């Protein structure tokens, strides 16, 4: 499913939206809570979101809420889940915000462990029918050593500039590509996704029974054709 990263929670329990083409229909709406004050009227905001889903023909809404879970955010999701279900829509939530009736999103942008173990553990815990992939496009620069495991996000032009002329390799454990470089005497490990790695993540999820996945627009706009080749 294509997800439109264009909505956020605003002051006064209002739904704010970036400009979208009036004729845009279908896909999912992504709800960000970045820099949002407490939601004081979750029922009213939930109704706004549901109305927008119906007006735009969205199949549902995905909550892109930062951890940790906050009581006001959970209250909104608890109002929204049955409201969307009554309209034949789906609510997608991050693992730290589980609510009854919602589908849990699993982020596939890993920097350690294995993706197969991650998905298998989630299937065992929640059941494949309650899961969907959050197919984030990974592009991260990790200085080595990196004890905290936190890298620096890269834009696509930055990634392309760093990768130019360098051999890249595939990590089967992470289902991602990588290369190394040395800058100012320090070694860097750059991990990234392309259409092939994202497709491999989809294939692995399907093997485990996870049939639903979200890709974000405009994040993967340049990969849509190779990513979904043969899907129609």
Summary of predicted features, one role per range:
Residues 1-114:
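Chitinase-like catalytic core of GlcNAc-active glycosidases
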Residues 11, 140-144, 221-224:
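Short catalytic/ligand-binding loop motif for oxyanion handling, primarily in non-cytosolic enzymes
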Residues 55-58, 83-91, 122-130, 200-212:
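A structural motif corresponding to the C-terminal end of an alpha-helix
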Residues 62-64, 91-95, 130-136, 214-216:
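A structural signal for short, well-ordered beta-strand segments and their strand-loop junctions
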Residues 71-89, 170-177, 222-232:
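Short acidic, glycine/proline-enriched helix-loop-strand junctions
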Residues 99-103, 108-116, 127, 131-141:
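A cross-taxonomic marker for long C-terminal extensions/tails that follow the last structured domain
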Residues 128-201:
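Glycan-binding loop/region signatures in secreted carbohydrate-active enzymes
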Residues 201-232:
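Acidic/aromatic/glycine-rich contiguous surface patches that form carbohydrate-binding/processing clefts
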